[in-house]
């Protein structure tokens, strides 16, 4: 798919969300106009928009609920595959924060000057998802290639888990056989998990943390994917008009007793005392 068409599709996909965001923002502005003008100290209360990977949706919803309860601030979220979100940011020039499933998308965004400061959050690992009890006796990557196994995975050109899987297995010369054995490609990692949950697939590759909300599924780790991990980070969008509010949400998200605690509860790997230093876009680190 060529780049102009990809960007056009991303804009079309984002249009309903952007209209909702603008509507909500207008409503908030109208309410503020009826009251006294806010002081500079209230700038962090302005509503913000987060572009968030589908793999982080469950934990993000929990964190946002906590944030609204504590501060009463509005947070709009657009969920989707990481590449699609990046394309939407590039086309629309809107939003305040970008949280893809893998830090490599933030590197691409910084190269395009779409994000500035970036902050570490958590880590996920690629695993083989199966239905609880393992009815198909899937224990190895080779088992996923069997003729009686329906194997699905996320599109490597759209989703972080798909790109990570392809890159990892290509280095080992294993990608072609898995690609040929794939029954279907899905738009994002949660769609893969949903296929297993409803019984339309037997196995697939997902991030381990995604299965936190799928009690009927479990996962196995295989040596071929032992190095397939994704660092989850959040970046401030360069053209954000609400940087004070965006920074307040980042501080909440990355606090050990707030957002990071929720990430631990949802099965993500989070250091007990992670470094909270900002990786500036100009630092080159």
Regions found by a protein language model. Name each.
Residues 2-78, 83-93, 100-112, 119-124, ...:
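Exported/periplasmic ABC-transporter solute-binding proteins
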């Amino acid at each position: 798919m060529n780049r102009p068409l990809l960007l056009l599709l991303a804009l079309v996909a984002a249009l309903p969300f952007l209209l909702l965001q603008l509507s909500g923002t207008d409503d908030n502005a109208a309410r503020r106009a009826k009251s006294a003008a806010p002081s500079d100290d209230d700038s962090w209360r302005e509503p913000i928009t987060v572009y968030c990977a589908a793999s982080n949706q469950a934990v993000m919803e929990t964190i946002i609920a906590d944030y609204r309860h504590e501060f009463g601030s509005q947070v709009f979220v657009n969920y989707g595959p990481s590449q699609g979100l990046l394309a939407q940011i590039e086309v629309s020039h809107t939003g305040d924060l970008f949280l893809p499933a893998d830090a490599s998308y933030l590197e691409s965004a910084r190269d395009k000057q779409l994000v500035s400061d970036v902050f570490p959050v958590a880590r996920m690992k690629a695993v083989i998802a199966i239905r609880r009890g393992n009815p198909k006796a899937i224990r190895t990557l080779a088992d996923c290639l069997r003729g009686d196994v329906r194997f699905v995975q996320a599109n490597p050109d759209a989703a972080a888990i798909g790109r990570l899987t392809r890159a990892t297995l290509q280095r080992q010369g294993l990608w072609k056989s898995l690609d040929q054995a794939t029954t279907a490609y899905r738009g994002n990692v949660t769609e893969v998990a949903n296929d297993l949950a409803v019984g339309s697939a037997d196995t697939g590759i997902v991030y381990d943390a995604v299965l936190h909300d799928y009690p009927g599924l479990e996962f196995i780790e295989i040596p071929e994917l032992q190095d397939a991990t994704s660092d989850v980070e959040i970046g401030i969008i360069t053209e954000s008009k609400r940087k004070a509010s965006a920074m307040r949400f980042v501080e909440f998200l990355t606090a050990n007793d707030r957002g990071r605690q929720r990430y631990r509860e949802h099965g993500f790997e989070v250091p007990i005392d992670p470094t909270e230093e900002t990786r500036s876009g100009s630092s080159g680190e």
